[in-house]
Amino acid sequence: QYPWGFLYYRAYPQSIFLPFGRPYGRFLYSILRIDYIDWEGYAYVGLTAFAGTLFFLYILVSKFVQRKYRQITSITYNRQLNILFWASLASLLFSFGVPFILGLERLIDFIGPIRQMRGIARFAWPFFYIMNILTIYWLWNWWKSKDKNLIAASVTTVALFMICTDAYYNVRNKGKSLENIMPALTDQNNEDPDNQWLQRLDLDRYQAIIPLPYFHIGSENIWLDGQCDIINKTFISVKNSGLPTMGSLLSRTSLNQTIENVSAITAPSCKNYYLNRYPTEMPFLLLVARCEKKYPHEKELIRHANWIDSTGVFDIYELHPKAFKIIQDSLFSNVVREYSSVNLHKFRDIYTTYSIRNFQFLTFDSLLNDTSFFGSGCLSGKAKNRTILYTGPVPSDDTTRTYNLTFWMSNIRTDLYPRTMITINETDSLGNKVNTLNFPVSKQIMQVSGNKALIEYEFHLADNSNQLNISAQNRILRNNMIQFDNILLRPVTTDVYISDGSTIWKNNFCYCKTD
């Protein structure tokens, strides 16, 4: 598995040589567009190194024009600096993505462990140091060769002044950002009001902390960023309690372990890989932020936990591992009760809470496939192409403009697949594009079953009479196949039920009783 962002976090000539972020470079923002450059792609070398680069390139071109080919490699009279110059120049070109951006992206598959270096813009850093050293070295020798005349001295002084000026802007106001402004983090004795709950609990009774809203960042495939400042609160609690956490904010995390943790926190499915995976039967501590930004499955965890303490910003609950099974059985019983209701309306094998069919449900059983999820077929297509999940009108006869899209996707435990992008285009009766929505699968996982995941996304329409075109694409997977099944589009006010006897689907979520 390789980390994402090899070419995304690359440098550009303007992010290396132009003074963006400097007071004397503010005018550039009105001239050049730089919104496509990620912050990790910036490594401004400074005015001195920029001028030195132009000068040395001029020398190289002059020698080439004069056919002094043997002298081209000699920028200075110092052999070591000449070697460093060419090495730093090669490193700079690599930071730009050369040669891969020249239509040779396929070569990335053959560079071995170098591909593990996610942000290649960092390869511009050697150029920053070497070019500044080389420029000052050349000016110093020029000054000495001119018998220390005024012009050479002035140019060298200006170059040194600009290096110092750029160095100042590099560190200006950095001190404030490095100061620790979190008393709770440096509280050694847990005396801070936000930490006093740690003194009131026997922490040895618990195996880990589960933060809610849940967050998990770092697998390069799943991105659940949490809400309500839960990340800071969680890591302060981890540091002061000594307990591990099921939340993650790391640069590299096992994808399979990520899916295991995510599957435990999201809606329970029929294939519970997590019921017996915990090392002990000790309970968990739920760290629950006081906000409304929680998913229904997170609220279920809270409902089946016992409140034990609180602070000014969050509540603490105790959750026993057996609660995961209890929650699944409870949800199954509730769905069975709803499914058995006489108030539901039947449309072939589908039951809904609305009397008129105002949903679209696509099973793709006519597209026979040996690797289908449910039934006899599924939708599949090459990842690099746009696979159309749905095209047509929105479900009719509904007054709301808020809709819910769910679908199942395969290979969720395989590298790169969760990075698939979903695009929703809305067009009017004349074919004019009204709105476009994009979202990654990695942020919308709501249920995991084996190597499959249920993706859910809620969106608003400009007008119910408009047409929808929903597609999926993953260019980095190229010719690999991506597969989808059971695509459901419904108004948020309508519930849809399907059953095959032992399993019931409510709004595309899978429910069954545990053994």
What are these regions, as identified by a protein language model?
Residues 133, 139-168:
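Signature aromatic-anchored transmembrane alpha helix within multi-pass, membrane-resident enzymes
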Residues 52-63, 85-88, 115-144:
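Transmembrane alpha-helices and membrane-interface helical segments
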Residues 165-378, 383-386, 476-479, 489-492, ...:
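Extracytoplasmic
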Residues 9-12, 31-41, 69-130, 181:
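Membrane-helix boundary/interfacial segments in multi-pass membrane proteins
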Residues 1-63, 465:
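Periplasmic/ER-lumenal interhelical loops and adjacent helix-loop junctions
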Residues 431-467, 477:
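Extracellular carbohydrate recognition and processing domains
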Residues 379-398, 433-440:
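Secreted extracellular polysaccharide-interacting domains
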Residues 244, 343, 347, 351-352, ...:
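Extra-cytoplasmic beta-strand recognition segments
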